[in-house]
Amino acid sequence: GGEPLLQMDFVTELFTLAKKEGIHTALDTAAGPYREDPEFKSQFDKLMAVTDLVLLDIKHIDEQSHKKLTGITNAYALSAARYLDSIGKPVWIRHVLVPGYTDDDKALEALADFLTSLNNIERIEVLPFHNLAAFKWKELGIKYTLAETLPPTQKRIDNARKILSRAGLVS
């Protein structure tokens, strides 16, 4: 489990074996570890050679809002998205709709603008936030800052899908 880009050698080996067996490979990543340096890029290119599809999480298009939500910049995910576009790798974008964090129209419009600039996006998934994992945080003794956050209404989900639909196929 966890972020596959932190385990690139293992995932590359696993995907290589899967491809030999004719199994389709999909990498599900938030791309937080993605870097432009030559060493990382070399490893990443090896992984992409055996990856059929990338499921890329873009938590927030605004850098400060992304940092507030995740603790890190969104520059890595956006850079990865641009690079994946440059190599023609098929990508499905996944955007978790968190009320009060990732559901404002201005940010959704900006995300749609960014995604429209890419030619490799095959699908955009709007994933409504839920609190099903709250118990895990409690068991770990870690404060869950989204514990009081309610799932988005169907109206907000439909709104996000409508805005993002101009950038591609939305589900």
Report residues per predicted region.
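C-terminal accessory region of radical SAM enzymes
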Residues: 90-91, 155-171
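A structural motif corresponding to the C-terminal lobe/cap of the Radical SAM core domain
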Residues: 113-116, 122, 138-163
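Glycine/small-residue-rich loop that forms an oxyanion/phosphate-binding "nest" at active or ligand-binding sites
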Residues: 1
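Conserved AdoMet/S-adenosylmethionine-binding subsite of the radical SAM
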Residues: 4-127, 132
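Glycine-centered secondary-structure boundary/capping sites
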Residues: 71, 138-141, 168
